[in-house]
UniProtKB/Swiss-Prot annotation:
Family designation: Belongs to the AB hydrolase superfamily. Lipase family. Class 3 subfamily.
Signal peptide positions on this chain: 1-16
Active site feature: 167 (nucleophile), 224, 277
SS bond list: 54-293
Xref: PANTHER family: ALPHA/BETA-HYDROLASES SUPERFAMILY PROTEIN, FUNGAL LIPASE-LIKE DOMAIN-CONTAINING PROTEIN
Entry's Gene Ontology cellular component terms: extracellular region
Function summary: Secreted lipase involved in Dandruff and seborrheic dermatitis (D/SD) probably via lipase-mediated breakdown of sebaceous lipids and release of irritating free fatty acids. Shows activity against monoglyceride and diglyceride substrates, but not triglyceride substrates and does not exhibit regio-selective production of diacylglycerols. Cleaves oleic acid from 1,2 isomers of diolein on both the 1 and the 2 position of the glycerol backbone, resulting mainly in free fatty acids but no monoolein is detected.
Alphabetical keyword list: Cell wall, Disulfide bond, Glycoprotein, Hydrolase, Lipid degradation, Lipid metabolism, Secreted, Signal, Virulence
Protein name from the UniProt record: Secreted mono- and diacylglycerol lipase MDL6
Amino acid sequence: MRLILLFLAFISFVLCVPEPRKVFGPTSYEEPTSLPVDLPLLSQAAGMAHEPYCHFNDEGKTVGDAEIVWTKWIGLAVQRAKIFHSKSLGVTVSFEGTTASILSILHDVNLALRDPPKELNDAYDEGSQLLSGFVDAYMDVRDDTYAEIVKCMQKYNDTRVTVTGHSLGAAMTALAAMDLEHRLEHGIYKAFAFAMPRTGNAKFASSVDNRIGGRFFYIANGRDWVPHMPPRDWGFQHPSGQVWINPVNSDNWKFYPGQENHFGANTVDPIWTFDDHHGYYFGTGVGHGPGTCPASVGTHTY
């Protein structure tokens, strides 16, 4: 079965790969700095990013300072989403990363850049284009998660809304953060995208900077290959907000200002396994292997 899935994913990849454009967005040469966000917030966000990998029937359980209040979908046809109420991050929605489902895999390999759908168009600056598969994954969950977020904001009298996720869920995090910034009166509070692939073009990256810059962060772990893909010369570009953990799974992390920072994760050749993709982020295990169910926050010792 696994070979069949890999074969289908390969065929889809071949059919969907865009022509190289050889056009790059900006590259930052700013020196790295210390973290611009408190470490406990990153640890807490990592735990909630992992939790969608866990199964149903966990409403009422806690992840760090957060209670799980809603969960939907099982990651086969639609990526699982969970909503928490966190003392430190408010109403938080988290999206599941890629599963073994062929439909989930197809979201990753549908690499064509497309204009935002009409429902998202006003959330982006003109000229923004998004990776098609990630848009499809987000649109599948958009309406139901938004309705539940609004309910939770009212229930807990909390206007803070945070978005998080890992891998494919990190790409969905970026799209959801932009969407919610536009739709909610108070916008988003924070967004944390763990192991995020490139999700759109240079105009998309600039849109993120213009609209949620300083509140959006994406985290790369060691030589994880996922944040390196799709390549920049296919027209893709990361926004600002990179936090790089290097060496992998260590407590050596720094913030790399600007887009595609020259001193950041782009300086290393990616390792083509999932060893660095699933790992320890700010003392919290994320992904298959390091993560626990329910997720444990900040329990890993270095």
